[in-house]
Amino acid sequence: MAKSSSKNKPTAASKSGALPEWNLNDLYPGPDSPELKWDLENAETRSAAFETDFKGKLLALAAGPEAGKALGAAVKRYEALDDTLGRVMSYASLRYAGDTADPAVAKFYGDMQERITAASLHLLFFMLELNRIDDATLEAAMADPALGHYRPWIEDVRKEKPYQLEDRIEELFHEKS
């Protein structure tokens, strides 16, 4: 009996013809597009500024006057940053998933992953500190519609509280992910 060669075996692409490709133009026109570059650089800058503005200050904001408005504004800024970073990473991930064999695409994906991880490290403190605010204080702050709007998200974040580790350990896990 003759052995079959892997050269003669049909592949999924040869069996089904040309496979469909994602149109990622709704995210970015291309990996070198000015829109992608601007979003990434802007998010990196805004992430560092967010950390400067809020790290170590959430407990005081929650206890201060206008706590709901102040925390609501912070969550709104966090949300905008998270959306931008997610959009960039979604684009990079989908490009890579569409062609894992292309070294240029793999490099682009790796570069984006590295930059997004570095930028999001500036945001990691936010959920950790939010979970340090006691329930009664946070509940009172959520009476303000500015923060109350984010109640479902805050409740999800609070579910992670029992599993939260020391900040430095969380940072280490984040860097390694």
Locate predicted features.
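A well-structured
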Residues: M1-S177
